[in-house]
């Protein structure tokens, strides 16, 4: 059996409130439900999926640093840090791990301050506006890209 791919899923601030936080924008699934669904998909794809949700920028940065040389791909929903965090951008650049930026809502159809991302220009791609399905699309894309590069 081939070595398992190792993918890190990161979720930023307030995503722990999914299911009750503005369900018209973010859907009714909780983060636990989304991650459980994604774990089942990852298992079927022979992928190890690690997950961290944090409201603290430093915790996400520390986990990105720890991923160096151990993680093949990062899936990140930076949430509000999308629009503010040069530090997360720098951490992602420092580890040189390809990543996909995920957003539940279509950030380009939201308020002007939500339309700028400090991560999009360095991401392998951005998936937004497809709700929880965006996580699945990101996982499938990461696995496909990794299998093409090996």
From Swiss-Prot:
Reaction(s) catalyzed by this protein? Answer: 3-dehydroquinate = 3-dehydroshikimate + H2O
Show the InterPro entries listed in the entry: DHquinase_II (IPR001874), DHquinase_II_CS (IPR018509), DHquinase_II_sf (IPR036441)
Q: Where is the active site?
A: 26, 103
Q: What is the lineage of its organism?
A: Bacteria, Pseudomonadati, Pseudomonadota, Gammaproteobacteria, Enterobacterales
Family label: Belongs to the type-II 3-dehydroquinase family.
The GO annotation for biological process reads: amino acid biosynthetic process; aromatic amino acid family biosynthetic process; chorismate biosynthetic process; quinate catabolic process
Keyword match Amino-acid biosynthesis:
yes
What metabolic or biological pathway is this protein involved in?
A: Metabolic intermediate biosynthesis; chorismate biosynthesis; chorismate from D-erythrose 4-phosphate and phosphoenolpyruvate: step 3/7
Q: What does this protein do?
A: Catalyzes a trans-dehydration via an enolate intermediate.
Q: Which GO terms describe its molecular function?
A: 3-dehydroquinate dehydratase activity
Q: What class of enzyme is it?
A: lyase
- What this protein is called in its record is 3-dehydroquinate dehydratase
Note the subunit structure: Homododecamer.
The alphabetized UniProt keywords are: Amino-acid biosynthesis, Aromatic amino acid biosynthesis, Lyase
Has the keyword Acetylation been applied to this entry?
no
Note the superkingdom of the native organism. Bacteria
Q: Where is this site: Transition state stabilizer?
A: 21
Encoding gene, per UniProt annotation: aroQ
What Enzyme Commission number(s) apply to this enzyme?
4.2.1.10
Locate the residues binding substrate: 77, 83, 90, 104-105, 114
């Amino acid at each position: 059996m081939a070595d398992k791919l190792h993918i890190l899923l990161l979720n930023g601030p307030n995503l722990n409130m999914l299911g009750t936080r503005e369900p018209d924008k973010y859907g009714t699934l909780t983060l636990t439900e989304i991650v459980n669904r994604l774990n089942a998909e990852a298992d079927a794809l022979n992928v190890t999926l690690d997950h961290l949700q944090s409201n603290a920028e430093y915790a996400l940065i520390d986990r990105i640093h720890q991923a160096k040389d151990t993680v093949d791909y990062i899936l990140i929903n930076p949430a509000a840090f999308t629009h503010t965090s040069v530090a997360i951008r720098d951490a992602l650049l420092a580890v040189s791990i390809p990543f996909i930026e995920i957003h539940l809502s279509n950030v380009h159809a939201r308020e002007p301050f939500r339309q700028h991302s400090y991560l999009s220009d360095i991401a392998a791609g951005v998936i937004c506006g497809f709700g929880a399905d965006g996580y699945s699309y990101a996982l499938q894309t990461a696995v496909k890209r990794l299998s093409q590069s090996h």
